[in-house]
A protein has these predicted regions:
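Membrane-interface helix termini and inter-helical loops of multi-pass transporters
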Residues: 4-13, 71-73, 139-145
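Membrane-interface helix/loop boundary segments of multi-pass membrane proteins
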Residues: 32-57, 70, 74, 93-101
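C-terminal membrane module of polytopic membrane proteins
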Residues: 113-186
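Small-polar-interrupted transmembrane alpha-helices in polytopic inner-membrane proteins
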Residues: 26, 30, 51-67, 84-88
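Juxtamembrane helix-loop-helix connectors linking adjacent transmembrane helices
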Residues: 1-35, 42-50, 179, 183-186
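Functionally important transmembrane alpha-helices
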Residues: 76-142
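Juxtamembrane helix-entry segments on the extracytoplasmic side of multipass membrane proteins
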Residues: 10-23, 73-83, 150, 154
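Hydrophobic alpha-helical transmembrane segments
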Residues: 19-20, 52-57, 81-82, 102-106, ...
């Protein structure tokens, strides 16, 4: 796309029903994962470990849960784990900013739906027949994410890191990078 790694072709077989079905599917995924990770687990661990240690632990567990997904091997595992952990940090920051699961659920739903149902990429290794279909141009997987999905790309990990830094601003004073790295644990 931006680096010439792929272009999108409209999928003529995809009707409007696909967009609604995908939304319901990814709502179920987002709701269940956020209820487990940011709802139950995060809130229980935060009392014992503090918010930043909990933030890192839950983000790493969130990434590890995806290790059994199709295509999660070799170099894909490294970049996908990094991006999924960044997503876990971002979703945790959304929870910390609002103290509500609505924003993490909405962001999680929106990302998965846009990536899979709308753009046709794999979502965490699960193939999708989307409204559009990505056609890859032989660029390396670390650039495009390949069949695994955008989470297996370096650009996704970098965007996740920038989003985390932006959202961490205002959560407890000091440098946002220090807060994310746990240097000012509260």
């Amino acid at each position: 796309f931006l680096a010439g790694g792929f272009h999108l072709v409209r999928n003529p077989a995809a009707g409007l029903g696909l967009l609604g079905t995908g939304a319901w599917l990814y709502l179920a995924v987002a709701f269940s994962e956020e209820l487990l990770f940011r709802g139950y687990l995060f809130q229980r661990l935060e009392k014992a470990l503090g918010r930043w240690r909990t933030q890192w632990l839950v983000a790493l567990l969130f990434a590890a849960v995806h290790w059994g997904n199709p295509g999660m091997t070799g170099s894909t595992r490294i970049l996908a784990s990094l991006s999924i952990a960044m997503a876990g940090l971002l979703l945790g920051l959304c929870y910390l900013r609002t103290r509500s699961l609505a924003l993490p659920i909405g962001l999680h739903l929106g990302w998965n739906w846009a990536q899979g149902t709308l753009l046709g990429f794999g979502v965490s290794g699960i193939p999708n027949g989307g409204w559009w279909t990505p056609v890859f141009h032989g660029q390396p997987e670390w650039l495009t994410g390949g069949a695994f999905g955008l989470e297996a790309s370096l650009p996704c990990a970098l965007v996740g890191a920038v989003a985390c830094l932006a959202l961490a601003r205002g959560l407890g004073g000091g440098n946002p990078a220090n807060r994310i790295m746990g240097n000012s644990i509260k």
